[in-house]
Amino acid sequence: MFTIDFNDHTDLVNESWYHQIEDLLNFAKEQEQINEDAELSVTFVDKNEIQEINKTYRDKDKVTDVISFALEEDEPEIVGLDMPRVLGDIIICTNVAEEQADSFGHSFERELGFLALHGFLHLLGYDHMNEEDEKVMFSRQDTILNAYGLTRD
């Protein structure tokens, strides 16, 4: 089972967005060959909240589009317990997603899907701190989005 806990701090999120993101992340989970039970949360926030989170936890006093908190980093694996794998939290700023969708000329739904997948890949350990890692992560993103059928059109 793959459980996604959605939280909307904006009161703007459409129920269909939850279904699209859940479907995309289930597809990505299969593409990444994660076979065990897993769970994560996706929270939608505004610019003020994401800036505060970014400042508090990343020491960056600016607005951003998505922040991920991987709960498995540096955590020992507990073997033998019948518990799902807790991947972490994805926080998406809906205001920035809307602006980026306009800027890139694609739908808001496509941008939300892209940001959710980007955050999901971070939870799995992908990163883009250097050029080589960026190529790997962004290539994986594009492969999954294209296979899923969520294009920039």
UniProtKB/Swiss-Prot annotation:
Cofactors (names): Zn(2+)
Source species of the chain: Staphylococcus haemolyticus (strain JCSC1435)
Xref: InterPro entries: MetalPrtase_cat_dom_sf_prd, YbeY, YbeY_CS
Comment on bound cofactor: Binds 1 zinc ion.
Main localization category: cytoplasm
Function: Single strand-specific metallo-endoribonuclease involved in late-stage 70S ribosome quality control and in maturation of the 3' terminus of the 16S rRNA.
A GO term for molecular function: zinc ion binding
Record has Secreted as a keyword: no
Domain of life of the source: Bacteria
Gene Ontology biological-process annotations: rRNA processing
Chain sites annotated for binding Zn(2+): 118, 122, 128
Pfam families recorded: YbeY
Record keywords, A-Z: Cytoplasm, Endonuclease, Hydrolase, Metal-binding, Nuclease, Ribosome biogenesis, rRNA processing, Zinc
NCBIfam families with a match to the protein in the record: rRNA maturation RNase YbeY (TIGR00043)
Keyword Metal-binding appears in the UniProt entry: yes
Descriptive protein name: Endoribonuclease YbeY
EC numbers on record: 3.1.-.-
